[in-house]
C-alpha cells in the first residue's frame, strides 16, 4: 500500500499555483462563409484592418481587402484547397511585410520574399512593410545623374536619370524585356543594385532571364522577384510592391537602385480579377475605379533622395504591353501619365530588323539632358535633329523619284545614322563608346561606306580606339566632356581606322 504524504502533495499544489500564469490571450476569430476562386468571405472578424493578414485554420494566409458591414472579403495567398465553409480564421494584427537584407542579392524569391531558387533560407534581421509611403516633396531632389542603359538610342535621345521613372511600352515580342535586361547588364561595376520583378510570366521566360543574368555575372547585384502565370492573383498583385520594398531598403542606405516591373499590365489584370470576384463595381475595360492608384502609389516610390537622406535613388522602369500599338487604352494612358517619359517599341521597326525597335519620334524623356554627361550632350543634339529631318524626308521621298543631291545626301546620312543605333542583345556599350559612335556618324565619316559595312566598321573602330587611343576614353571618363584634345585624338583614330577598313574591303 502506497503511503500518501500530505506535506508532499501540498508542496506540489503550492508550486503549481505559483507557476500558474493568469495571462489571457484574446484572439480575434471569424468563420468562413464562402470560399472559391481565390476569395473567401468571413463572418465575425470584428476588429480587422484594411490590408491586414489573416490566417486560416489549415495555415493559408490571406489579405483582408473588403471590409463590409456583415462580412470581410479576403484574397488568398495560396490555393486554399483545404479551406472549408465553417472553418475558423484568426486576424494576425499585422500588415503584410517582408524581411530585407543584403543576403537577398543574387537570389530568386516570390512575392512573400521566400526563396524559390532551391538555395536554402535567406537570413535577414530587418523587415519592411510591403506597402510603405513614398518619399515626400522635402525628402527628394531633382534628377541630375545619368543611369546609363548601354543602348545608344536611349542614352543619347531618351536619357534616363537616377530616380526617374521611364515607361517601356510596346506590343508583345518587340524586345521590351531585352531593353530592361540590357540595362541591368550595363550596371556592372556602377554600384547600382537591380531588382527585376516578373509578374504573370511563363516560368520558362523567367528562367531564361535569370540564366542570362547569371552567365554574364549580373546576378551578383540583382534580386529577381517572380510570380509566374500560375500563381494566385493576390501574389501577382503583391509582387511589384515586394520588389519596391527591397529596392527601398537599399535606397535608404544611400545606395542607387534600379527596379524593373515586367509587366504592369499583368498586375492590373490580376487586380481586376480580385476586384471583380470581391464584387467591387467595374469601371472602364472592367478595371476597378482605383486601378490608377494601384500604379501611382507603386511608381511614386521611385525617387532621388535629398542630401539629408543620403542621396540614394530608386529608378523605375515599368513595362506595359499594348495591343496592336494602341497607346490610348486604359492602362497605357494611366502609366504614361504617372511616369517621367516613355520608350515606345514598335513592332514594324522590329520586323524591319531595326533592333532595339525604339520609335524615337514618339519616345520622350521628361528629365531630358539633365540626365546626360556633357560629352553626350555635345554629340546627341545633332543626332536628334538629323534623325528627325531624315524621318520627314523619308516619308516625302517615297512619292518623288528625282531628288536633288543635297536631299540624297541627307537621306544617305539618315540611313547610316539609323544603322548606327542598331545593337545586338546583351551587348551594352559604355558611354565613351557611345560618344565615339555618334560622333563618327554625325560628322559624316560613315557617308563613304555602304550601309551593310557600317556596323562592321564601328565594331572594328571601337576595338582600335580601345587598344591604340586609350587616352580618348581616359579624357571622357575623367572630365565627362568632349574636350578639344579628345576630339583631335578621336578624329585621328577614326581616319586611321577608316583607311585600314577601306583597304581591307578592297582586298
Curated annotation (Swiss-Prot):
Residues bound to ATP: 170-177
Keywords, comma-separated and alphabetical: ATP synthesis, ATP-binding, CF(1), Chloroplast, Hydrogen ion transport, Ion transport, Membrane, Nucleotide-binding, Phosphoprotein, Plastid, Thylakoid, Translocase, Transport
EC number: 7.1.2.2
The keyword Transmembrane helix belongs to this UniProt entry's keyword annotation: no
Domain of life: Eukaryota
Protein name: ATP synthase subunit alpha, chloroplastic
Gene3D superfamilies per record: 2.40.30.20, ATP synthase alpha/beta chain, C-terminal domain (1.20.150.20), P-loop containing nucleotide triphosphate hydrolases (3.40.50.300)
Cellular compartments per GO CC: chloroplast thylakoid membrane; proton-transporting ATP synthase complex
Topology in the lipid bilayer: Peripheral membrane protein
Lineage of origin: Eukaryota, Viridiplantae, Streptophyta, Embryophyta, Tracheophyta
Amino acid at each position: 500500500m502506497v503511503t500518501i504524504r500530505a506535506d508532499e502533495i501540498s508542496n506540489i499544489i503550492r508550486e503549481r499555483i505559483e507557476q500558474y500564469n493568469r495571462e489571457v490571450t484574446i484572439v480575434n476569430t471569424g468563420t468562413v462563409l464562402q470560399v472559391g476562386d481565390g476569395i473567401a468571405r468571413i463572418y465575425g472578424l470584428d476588429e480587422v484592418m484594411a490590408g491586414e493578414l489573416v490566417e486560416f485554420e489549415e495555415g493559408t494566409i490571406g489579405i483582408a481587402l473588403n471590409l463590409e458591414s456583415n462580412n470581410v472579403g479576403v484574397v488568398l495567398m495560396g490555393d486554399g484547397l483545404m479551406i472549408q465553409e465553417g472553418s475558423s480564421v484568426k486576424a494576425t494584427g499585422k500588415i503584410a511585410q517582408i524581411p530585407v537584407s543584403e543576403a537577398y542579392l543574387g537570389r530568386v524569391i516570390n512575392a512573400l520574399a521566400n526563396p524559390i531558387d532551391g538555395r536554402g533560407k535567406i537570413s535577414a534581421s530587418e523587415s519592411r512593410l510591403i506597402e510603405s509611403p513614398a518619399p515626400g516633396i522635402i525628402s527628394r531632389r531633382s534628377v541630375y545623374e545619368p543611369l546609363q542603359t548601354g543602348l545608344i538610342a536611349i542614352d543619347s535621345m531618351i536619357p534616363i536619370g537616377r530616380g526617374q521613372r521611364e515607361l517601356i511600352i510596346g506590343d508583345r515580342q518587340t524586345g521590351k524585356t531585352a531593353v530592361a535586361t540590357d540595362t541591368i547588364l550595363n550596371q556592372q561595376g556602377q554600384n547600382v543594385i537591380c531588382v527585376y520583378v516578373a509578374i504573370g510570366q511563363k516560368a520558362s521566360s523567367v528562367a531564361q532571364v535569370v540564366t542570362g543574368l547569371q552567365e554574364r555575372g549580373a546576378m551578383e547585384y540583382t534580386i529577381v522577384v517572380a510570380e509566374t502565370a500560375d500563381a494566385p492573383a493576390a501574389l501577382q498583385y503583391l509582387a511589384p510592391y515586394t520588389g519596391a520594398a527591397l529596392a527601398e531598403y537599399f535606397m535608404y542606405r544611400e545606395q542607387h537602385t534600379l527596379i524593373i516591373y515586367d509587366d504592369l499590365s499583368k498586375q492590373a489584370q490580376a487586380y481586376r480579377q480580385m476586384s471583380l470576384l470581391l464584387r467591387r463595381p467595374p469601371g472602364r475595360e472592367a478595371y476597378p475605379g482605383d486601378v490608377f492608384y494601384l500604379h501611382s502609389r507603386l511608381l511614386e516610390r521611385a525617387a532621388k533622395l535629398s542630401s539629408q537622406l543620403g542621396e540614394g535613388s530608386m529608378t523605375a522602369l515599368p513595362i506595359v504591353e499594348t495591343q496592336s500599338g494602341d497607346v490610348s487604352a486604359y492602362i497605357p494612358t494611366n502609366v504614361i501619365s504617372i511616369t517621367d517619359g516613355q520608350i515606345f517599341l514598335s513592332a514594324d521597326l522590329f520586323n524591319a530588323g531595326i533592333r532595339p525597335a525604339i520609335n524615337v519620334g514618339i519616345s520622350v524623356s521628361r528629365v531630358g539632358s539633365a540626365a546626360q554627361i556633357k560629352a553626350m550632350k555635345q554629340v546627341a543634339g545633332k543626332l536628334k535633329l538629323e534623325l528627325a529631318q531624315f524621318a520627314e524626308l523619308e516619308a516625302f521621298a517615297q512619292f518623288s523619284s528625282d531628288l536633288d543631291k543635297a536631299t540624297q545626301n541627307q537621306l544617305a546620312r539618315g540611313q547610316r545614322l539609323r544603322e548606327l543605333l542598331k545593337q545586338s542583345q546583351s551587348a551594352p556599350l559604355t558611354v565613351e563608346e557611345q560618344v565615339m559612335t555618334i560622333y563618327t556618324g554625325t560628322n559624316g565619316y560613315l557617308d563613304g561606306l555602304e550601309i551593310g559595312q557600317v556596323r562592321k566598321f564601328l565594331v572594328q573602330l571601337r576595338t582600335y580606339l580601345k587598344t591604340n587611343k586609350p587616352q580618348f576614353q581616359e579624357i571622357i571618363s575623367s572630365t565627362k566632356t568632349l574636350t578639344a584634345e579628345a576630339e583631335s585624338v578621336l578624329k585621328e583614330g577614326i581616319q586611321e581606322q577608316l583607311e585600314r577598313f577601306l583597304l581591307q574591303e578592297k582586298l
